[in-house]
Design a protein with these regions (language model features):
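Conserved "HGTGT" condensation-loop signature of ketosynthase/thiolase-family condensing enzymes
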Residues: 1-147
Length: 147
């Protein structure tokens, strides 16, 4: 594809976000504009042995607000964030999916690295408890593109 001659237009119709400074676009934006960093003492991970004890954690997130319990259980937390943000984006897009060509819709989603808690859990089971099997959901839960 020659990008010089690529004349397709892209229109952003919906956005969603789950972050340490907001779990909706409006809350995220307001906190960003007000200069709130979302950085605080880490509470969700054990920081013993590490000099850094601060970070940006997502708190008060309930996946059951966005999906049923069975779905949530099959997903790593970062994938749950992606679903929640996607649902907000779909809602804010206000598109009638019955009247548009679905092949013309795309999604841009960013994640750094997902599923690290699942990797840690399975490593502990295998190497410290000498368990010879891993969860069948391990691979789907740890892959970044599962978000």
């Amino acid at each position: 594809m020659n990008l010089k001659n690529y004349n397709e237009r892209v229109v952003v119709t919906g956005m969603g976000v789950i972050s340490c400074i907001g779990q909706t676009v409006n809350k995220f934006w307001n906190n960003l504009v007000e200069g709130n960093s979302g950085i605080s003492k880490l509470t969700q991970v054990n920081t013993d042995g590490y000099s850094c004890k601060i970070g940006g954690e997502i708190t008060n997130f309930d996946p059951n607000d966005y999906m049923d319990k069975k779905e949530a259980k099959r997903m790593a937390r970062f994938s749950q964030f992606a679903v929640a943000a996607s649902l907000e984006a779909i809602s804010s897009a206000d598109l009638d999916f019955n009247k548009i060509d679905l092949d013309q819709i795309g999604v841009f989603l960013g994640t750094g690295s997902g599923g690290l808690p699942e990797t840690e859990k399975e490593d502990l089971l295998m190497f410290q408890k000498n368990k010879n099997t891993i969860s069948p959901l391990y691979v789907p839960k740890m892959l970044p593109n599962m978000a």
